[in-house]
Amino acid sequence: MLFKSLLLLSVYAVTCYGQSKVPVYVYYESLCPDSARFINEQLYPVAKELKKNLELHLVPFGKSSYTTQGSDVMFTCHHGENECYGNKVHACAIQHIQGNSYQPNISKEDLTLDYVNCLMHRAQLKDGAFPTKRCADEVKIDQWQAIMDCANSTEGSQLLKQHGDVTNKLQSPLKSVPTVAFKQTYDDELQKLSVSSFRHALCKNLSPQPVECLDLPSTGSAISSLGMIVTVVAVLISRLL
């Protein structure tokens, strides 16, 4: 009975220490090479691995700007008109992607990140039209037509304007793209760390930290506490065997 209790305590300790979640806002542009590199090589793999510890908010606007004339919204984008359209596709995807019965174990958030990752990769190849449908086919989402209709309508403009307002609330204009803000607060040192090693930046902001952060240097007292708990429980269990 004591053995089972100690084993459950060990599992409980590890589980509890892996449940912290931090809001992360990523401000990016649909045709920005630096944004694509960051999302494809850093954000995507880390967010997939640590999704239980990450509340991800994607904000596709970057250094764009907008003006309004009545109900019309006109955008000027860092990489030209095509990027304005691409930003609208991203904004519409974030709004319209839903989970589906064909992928019951994949959430709306998972599908959205998969789709955005594909869009950023494919758009950099510059091999034709913006990859709205191609990525929808690859990721297996059903809402590509709704995304297309949205991007080509006032809905897309309004959604992109909302992302612009979120961006301008952080910085107007952004100092650099992509920008990563934890808890929607800009920190210059965290920004530098995020773009060089997003995993380190995320783990630094998790308290207590999950086991996925154990292999990183300077993991802090939270990891030491977790290691101590698990070690003590392991020793107690070994003495009972």
Curated annotation (Swiss-Prot):
UniProt cross-references to InterPro entries, sorted A to Z: Interferon-induced_GILT
Its membrane topology: Single-pass membrane protein
Subcellular location: Membrane
Signal peptide: 1-18
Induction field: Up-regulated in midgut in response to a blood meal. (Microbial infection) Infection of salivary gland with Plasmodium berghei does not affect expression.
Main localization of the protein described in the UniProt heading: membrane
Record key words, sorted: Glycoprotein, Membrane, Signal, Transmembrane, Transmembrane helix
GO molecular function, one term: oxidoreductase activity
Glycosylation sites: 105, 152
GO cellular component, one term: membrane
Function: Required for normal development of ovary and testis. (Microbial infection) Interacts with the surface of Plasmodium berghei sporozoites. Reduces P.berghei sporozoite cell traversal activity and transmission. Limits the motility of P.berghei sporozoites. Decreases the levels of host liver infection by P.berghei sporozoites. Does not affect P.berghei sporozoite viability. Indirectly promotes P.berghei survival in mosquitoes by influencing ovarian development and the subsequent production of 20-hydroxyecdysone and vitellogenin, which, in turn, modulates TEP1-dependent parasite killing.
Something else known: While mosGILT is an abundant protein in Anopheles gambiae salivary glands, it does not appear to be present at detectable levels as a soluble component of saliva, suggesting that the interaction between mosGILT and Plasmodium parasites potentially begins at some point in the salivary glands and then allows the protein to travel in association with the sporozoites into the mammalian host.
Family recorded in the similarity comment: Belongs to the GILT family.
Name under which the protein is recorded: Gamma-interferon-inducible lysosomal thiol reductase-like protein
